[in-house]
A protein has these predicted regions:
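Catalytic-core regions of glycoside hydrolase
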Residues: 1-63
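Catalytic domains of carbohydrate-active enzymes that cleave complex glycans
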Residues: 64-182
């Protein structure tokens, strides 16, 4: 569907918000961390142009008084029932410094994964254009095939080690291609 719309010049975005619930991966507190990270691999596989998050520091519902907010009052992570943590990826510190959540750090890892994948795809194009390393083309294309990791939008690996291994293999392949292209 996305590719068809993109042929008309449209950009396709995913939005992770209160509506995206199990079995779809999302950024809620009670979901496994791989669900936060796999979305970027899916975006590459399904040719999605962007992932939109409506908020990272939506700390609404708190009184204006200085001592009426967290950490002086209990934190209410249930601002959106059924979507725990939606809009909360940064948390306010006592000194008003924002603190990163583990989820935000996993999301960052997913963004970095996407960058590695993107770089490898671009290196593959260079390799083909230069007509070098023909034996590397198939291996590179195989690394960019995520069918063993993602079979649908709701069926994907639950094992983070598979993503770690694939990312490492992608990084090594980038280095190998760079040596060939020099």
């Amino acid at each position: 569907w996305a590719v068809k719309r993109q042929k008309y010049g449209e950009k396709i975005w995913w939005c992770d918000n209160i509506g995206s619930k199990y079995p779809y991966p999302n950024w809620y507190i009670d979901e496994p961390a791989i669900n936060h990270r796999i979305q970027f691999w899916m975006a590459f596989k399904y040719k999605i142009d962007a992932i939109f998050s409506w908020g990272a520091n939506v700390w609404g519902g708190y009184k204006a008084g200085e001592n009426d907010k967290w950490p002086y009052q209990p934190w209410n992570a249930m601002t959106y029932p059924g979507a725990n943590g939606d809009g909360y990826q940064l948390y306010p510190g006592i000194d008003k410094t924002p603190y990163s959540s583990i989820r935000l750090e996993v999301i960052r890892d997913g963004i970095e994964d996407y960058e590695y994948i993107y770089i490898l795809r671009e290196k593959l194009k260079e390799l083909k254009k230069a007509r070098k390393g023909e034996n590397m083309v198939a291996a590179t294309e195989s690394l960019l095939d995520f069918s063993s990791l993602i079979t649908s939008l709701v069926k994907f690996t639950a094992n983070p080690e598979e993503l770690f291994r694939r990312r490492e293999m992608i990084a090594l392949q980038i280095e190998k291609i760079d040596k060939i292209l020099k």
